[in-house]
Amino acid sequence: MAFNLRNRSFVKELDFTPQELMFLITLAADLKAAKYAGTEQPQLSGKNIALIFEKTSTRTRCAFEVAAHDQGAHVTYLDPSGSQIGHKESIKDTARVLGRMFDAIEYRGASQATVEELAEYAGVPVWNGLTDEWHPTQMLADFLTIMEHTDKPLREVTLAYMGDARNNLGNSLTVTGAMLGIDVRMVAPRELWPDEERVAAPARAIAETTGARVTFTDDIAEGLAGADFIYTDVWVSMGEPSEVWDERIRQLLPYQVNAEALKATGNPDVKFLHCLPAFHDLGTEVAREIHARTGLTALEVTDEVFESPASIVFDQAENRMHTIKALMVATLGR
């Protein structure tokens, strides 16, 4: 079935129906195959796209820039040091200015209200590259990766997320898992579960219509049993003060994804997902600082798991580009 998503914004997962999300994922798979085969046809020639980054990025920025280039579009990168956005010019005014100059706008920053205001006033498609509440473009990449690494239909897939489940990734996985009909489990301390009113209750309501199973548990054995995929994220998100590290380590060290966690699934074919960057070794300044204070050589995932055959994190990272390209083509293409 074809869908017309032209001129639609994507600021949170619920902007689209489950069928529309699956259309985007399928389109991404087709665009990926075309890129590999050398048969990709540009559909965004002459388009101009603004990339607003109030938060730093490697994967998201590169994914948008390469996807746009592949499709013939031009991008303009705007960061806080190079624009007046939110400082000397309101978001509403910025949206109306950029909407006159650009064909679409990507926003990555703290405030969900900001990306929603951009979408309300710009008059062109606006895409959420990440906010503190939601990470919708990551979900497209995650579920393309899941579909590439299982022979099961999604309704038979079990995904267990370990760690801080109240962050943007936990929110998005809970809702998207419900929308796409999987068995999605948030395995985390109770104080780090997603917000009941904003995330958990809507996800349960969606699950009643899609056949999904949505579980919140602090019981690691229960949460991991039979899982096809284990997913984790950093324990301290961008924008949080560094002082919270010690408390978060105390809360989440039992929820580290390690060899024992993989074994607890009882599934020899279990796969590991992470949206990256990951603190799996001492290769970063932050990790070395934490090691000096705590003696830990890894945080949310051990190096053993990260570098194991179970790890599909770099397939997942690549798929950011293919799925973002699908979003751009579907909402902006000719």
UniProtKB/Swiss-Prot annotation:
Disulfide bonds listed in the record: none
PROSITE patterns xrefs: CARBAMOYLTRANSFERASE
Keyword Amino-acid biosynthesis part of the UniProt annotation: yes
InterPro entries: Asp/Orn_carbamoyltranf_P-bd (IPR006132), Asp/Orn_carbamoylTrfase (IPR006130), Asp/Orn_carbamoylTrfase_sf (IPR036901), Asp_carbamoyltransf_Asp/Orn-bd (IPR006131), Orn/put_carbamltrans (IPR002292), OTCase_ArgI (IPR024904)
Its EC number(s): 2.1.3.3
GO molecular function term, any single one: ornithine carbamoyltransferase activity
Compartment annotation: Cytoplasm
SUPFAM superfamilies named among the record's database cross-references: Aspartate/ornithine carbamoyltransferase
Pfam families attached to this UniProt entry: OTCace, OTCace_N
The UniProt record lists the keyword Transferase: yes
Catalytic activity: carbamoyl phosphate + L-ornithine = L-citrulline + phosphate + H(+)
GO terms of biological process kind: arginine biosynthetic process via ornithine; citrulline biosynthetic process; L-arginine biosynthetic process
Record: residues binding L-ornithine: N168, D233, S237, M238
GO cellular component, one term: cytoplasm
Record keywords: Amino-acid biosynthesis, Arginine biosynthesis, Cytoplasm, Transferase
Residues the record lists as binding carbamoyl phosphate: S57, T58, R59, T60, Q84, R108, H135, P136, T137, Q138, C275, L276, R320
Pathway linked to the protein: Amino-acid biosynthesis; L-arginine biosynthesis; L-arginine from L-ornithine and carbamoyl phosphate: step 1/3
Family the UniProt entry places it in: Belongs to the aspartate/ornithine carbamoyltransferase superfamily. OTCase family.
Record function comment: Reversibly catalyzes the transfer of the carbamoyl group from carbamoyl phosphate (CP) to the N(epsilon) atom of ornithine (ORN) to produce L-citrulline.
NCBIfam families according to UniProt: orni_carb_tr, PRK00779.1, PRK04284.1
Full protein name: Ornithine carbamoyltransferase
Organism: Thermobifida fusca (strain YX)
Gene (name only): argF
